[in-house]
């Protein structure tokens, strides 16, 4: 993986790893990208057992999952707690996700979704250009919405996990 002048892995190299992981997916397989621990927040877990008690909360990190569905790549980004999702996005972050092409899906649960290609597939599973667009969208989401750059911060890159 290439590195920036400080010796840290670069976002470009990280994106290349994600492209490779996506292109290697079999039908029904997925890769999940989990934000670094520094992006974790307290979120509600499970349902309430008694209505007068507050919901339990746990430290939760945002994630994006890319799943191969025949010739398409389906992207899911953890949904907003306010809409029944598992992460406490702020109103500004929700708007930023929408601006970056993610949209809530009433049919598929509380998560945000995107598809690549965003048109009719032109051939067998995902051309490299679409895999690169998907990786760039995930990187932009994690870099600009989840962990906006902080001057002087040396934040780690997100983890890429094969499901």
List where the protein language model places each region.
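Structured alpha/beta or helical-core interaction and ligand-binding surfaces enriched in interleaved
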Residues: 1-163
């Amino acid at each position: 993986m290439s590195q920036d002048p400080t010796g840290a892995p670069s976002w470009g190299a990280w994106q290349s790893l994600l492209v490779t992981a996506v292109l290697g997916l079999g039908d029904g397989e997925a890769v999940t990208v989990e934000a670094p621990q520094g992006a974790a927040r307290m979120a509600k877990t499970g349902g309430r057992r008694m209505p007068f008690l507050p919901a339990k909360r746990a430290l939760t990190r945002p994630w994006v999952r890319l799943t191969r569905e025949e010739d398409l790549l389906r992207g899911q980004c953890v949904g907003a707690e306010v809409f029944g999702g598992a992460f406490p996005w702020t109103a500004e972050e929700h708007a930023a996700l929408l601006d970056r092409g993610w949209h809530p899906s009433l049919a598929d649960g509380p998560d945000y979704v995107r598809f690549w290609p965003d048109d009719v597939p032109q051939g067998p599973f995902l051309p490299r250009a679409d895999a690169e667009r998907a990786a760039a969208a995930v990187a932009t989401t994690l870099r600009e919405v989840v962990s906006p750059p902080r001057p002087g911060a040396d934040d780690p890159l997100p983890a890429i996990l094969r499901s």
